[in-house]
Amino acid sequence: MAVNSKYHHSCINCGGLNTDERNERGLPCEVCLPEDSPSDIYRALLERKTLKEYRFYHEFWNEYEDFRSFFKKKFGKDLTGYQRLWAKRIVQGKSFTMVAPTGVGKTTFGMMTALWLARKGKKSALVFPTVTLVKQTLERLQKLADEKVKIFGFYSSMKKEEKEKFEKSFEEDDYHILVFSTQFVSKNREKLSQKRFDFVFVDDVDAVLKASRNIDTLLMMVGIPEEIIRKAFSTIKQGKIYERPKNLKPGILVVSSATAKPRGIRPLLFRDLLNFTVGRLVSVARNITHVRISSRSKEKLVELLEIFRDGILIFAQTEEEGKELYEYLKRFKFNVGETWSEFEKNFEDFKVGKINILIGVQAYYGKLTRGVDLPERIKYVIFWGTPSMRFSLELDKAPRFVLARVLKEMGLIKAQENPDVEELRKIAKEHLTQKEFVEKVKEMFRGVVVKDEDLELIIPDVYTYIQASGRSSRILNGVLVKGVSVIFEEDEEIFESLKTRLLLIAEEEIIEEAEANWKELVHEVEESRRRSERELTDTSRSLLIIVESPTKAETLSRFLGRASSRKERNIIVHEAVTGEGVILFTATRGHVYDLVTKGGIHGVEEENGKFVPVYNSLKRCRDCGYQFTEDRDECPVCSSKNIDDKTETLRALREISLEADEILVATDPDVEGEKISWDVTQYLLPSTRSLRRIEMHEITRYGFKKARESVRFVDFNLVKAQIVRRVQDRWIGFELSGKLQKRFGRSNLSAGRVQSTVLGWIVEREEEYKKSEKDFTLLVLENGVNLEVEGKIADDVVTVVELQEAEEEKNPLPPYTTSSALSEISQKLRLGVQEVMDILQDLFEKGFITYHRTDSTRISLEGQNVARTYLRKIGKEDIFMGRSWSTEGAHEAIRPVKPIDARELEEMIEEGLIADLTKKHLRVYELIFNRFLASQSAAVKVKKQIVTVDVDGKRMGIEQIVEILRDGWNLFVPLTVSPRFEHRTYKIKEKKFYKKHTVPLFTQASIVEEMKKRGIGRPSTYAKIVEVLFRRGYVYEDKYKRVRPTRFGVMVYSYLKERYEKYVTEETTRRLEEIMDKVERGEEDYQATLRLLYEEIKSLMEEG
């Protein structure tokens, strides 16, 4: 259901102008193909002699289906989900890393690709790490191949005549497929570099990467000249990216995923010359139940081992503890092995079932922690104590991150200073005793454990825990098998600290022993492995997720275990492997299209009585930042040719979309996000049909999972609402801006309904402010109370004439919406509203808060549970009072997504668990967190006084809280408690006379409040409107952070009010906002609304 728009560069055949209606139906533009419903688009274009780019898509799908049927015929099975993705890349001629778990057919795919290419007369080389694999592959290939396919292999133990046969065919290029070992690549570098292969498959990239010169050899084997490799390497050494010559068309290089991280910079040659990085399988797909047992009881351990019986790893904190456990369990006749003296032998015995239990030591790089991938055997992981990092707190030995944090907090070093550890220790000794230092650490590092007697800081090693527990749950034959992790931990502080970090990093929770049903868990563990052994239908799929922001794509891919990244034209694509297959993440980097500026009515054509918006790709000058839509090679402002054109982004998305089985557009959950979603969807529909929309309200694993459960198509009411807003902005903005520019002779001036209305408030408030100056006196009473009284007070006493006391329950404020967040955070932290909005955007995209553009105060049950969990953690569950606040609103209020406070986040930044958060981010997060927790806490019971006093013959009322009777939400948002009054006369200790304006000037915060109150603007535009007023020079901020109009701003507003008042009145602006809201809800026809807008500004246009 298209929305009657035209898009430049969207025709799938000529790349020209097409309608969204034709794109939705998969049709090229009318110039290429006037027909409305051809039975065969390719043939119709061919017959009209207008066939262009559509040939590529037609041939792509034909080639892919040919590969698929060939594979099925030869191998007897259809492609798996992983293999479908790889096949589509092969057909497109792309090099890549095969990132996938074991048992999904990587080697089979490499062989079948070589055989398929051989049919086309193309040459392939298959490289394996061992002679055994070379032999096995040769045998399999010869069984599968047709007689005409020439296959030769080489290994050292071959017969003499076979070697000679290989060498002859190799020298004469008389072969289709060659199979040899990594060692052969190293020894025959010169010969191989002279050959040109269409396809090179490397089965064990780790073995190849051991000798960095092998990388050059592989690149030359696919046709990249040595001179280009040298140039590329030289560029990479300078920290730059090498741009491969456009005329260079190399063959395809496919490598298996690495197990170790590639070292050095030479592997970056793959990135710059073949557009892929050597990825590692870092699957975070896990299905683990974590259980905590709150005592280190060996009897309990024995009881548990008798339930589990087999497939058990035990991690002790030290080798001594491990030996003690080993000897203890031997006494109970358990079949147990250790890993500190005979790792290889005992591990092999464990592998084949001769040993049931294996004991190792907790260590991040330990062999048992990282070097083991045996999900068929490892089912249960037991930790004898929490994996921890221990740091001395002696002033001579304390670690740098602890010293720096303490000294910065005390103001002894500046935030930007970076002294070395010895200098830090020296400063600490000069200003702190050992006892004071430990007390400071306790006060500041709340989420860790400080042992006074040992002067030791203990931080749970969450990454070691995640790595080691993950041995029990992996993808096995396409099935994510179940695992159980048990932690024996007595120390409550250490356990809570681990629990918090596990929730942040892996989004996994730990249950207590009482909640665990061991019998049921054992059944789930065994059943998942039985399922992996059965002959199952392959359910793996490839999925492409398109978001707006590269940060969001990066955050999501990291949560799901990013395995590799690559560049596709001008965008980055991240790849992750999950239990259901491969997920690709990429970003549009904001809007991809905008209204053209020339033609029609400011970019909107009128056809058959209907308005048709015309869009072109957005272009942005990388040098000066100017944005435009015209098709031109240089910036219209600074003439730079360094242009970022979203046409490239769209083309890249079309190419990537061909790889995936399913595409989900996950742009922001608002009207702007919906419009971007439609812009992308209509562009991709001609080349792929499996395309839907999801909304993510938080960037977490949970948020992603929940969004996947509510897949839908684009909401056209939201798209239409965005079009109406944009067209209204364009029409009124262009017309009024043109009048201003002409009147004042300045080309950078702008006007708009909301912008000009708000400017009017500021101008008028300035006038009211100037007229409102009055005398005031500040009285400081002997009981410590300050009273502000209008007028000049002569008396030296204040008499209490009436006094009442009452108990009252005070309820909390609701959680933040966009307007209340911008207003309060801007005010409290003295930040501009645009800066606050940018910080909120960062916190959302990095997965710390829910979506930040919202008018709703609603809190979901999941949100309420975040509050309950945190209150339980700090021992305050008794004050939990779950409130939904509202049942309305597509979004929730702004809230934290995890029960982790700002102090804990700060500690995790110091530990390196979190990156890219500044002090400002933490302060904003703290305000959001506290406001949210307050909103979910019980009412505060207070005692208040209602007092009437006589001052200079005038009576004034005072109401104040004098006592907190029962704590509640005030633990997060403190209340002011004032000194009590008694029924008597109080001396005035001090008087201060001053003049004060009774009408306050606006601040950025109060402008946003006013916009919300008067129904002007929207959550997504509040900050932007304020920012535009500053940028245009209409307003400025004085030293008290008050917003005031410039002389020029007053002139602009006076001119608009005098000449064009009806277009910029508050009433007109509010009425239009209401109409646009109705379009969003589907209650108003959007074409009729555009007609109404047009008729309203027609006279303005005709004025000239």
UniProtKB/Swiss-Prot annotation:
Top-level lineage group: Bacteria
Cofactor binding annotation: Binds 2 zinc ions per subunit.
A GO CC annotation given for this chain: cytoplasm
Subcellular location as annotated: Cytoplasm
Signal peptide as annotated in the record: none
Molecular functions (GO terms): ATP binding; ATP hydrolysis activity; DNA binding; DNA topoisomerase type II (double strand cut, ATP-hydrolyzing) activity; reverse gyrase activity; zinc ion binding
Co-factor(s): Zn(2+); Mg(2+)
Thermal dependence of function as given in the entry: Optimum temperature is 90 degrees Celsius for production of positive supercoils. Thermostable for at least 4 hours at 85 degrees Celsius. Optimum temperature is 65 degrees Celsius for ATPase activity. The necessity for high temperature for positive supercoiling is probably because reverse gyrase preferentially binds to ssDNA.
Protein name: Reverse gyrase
Organism: Thermotoga maritima (strain ATCC 43589 / DSM 3109 / JCM 10099 / NBRC 100826 / MSB8)
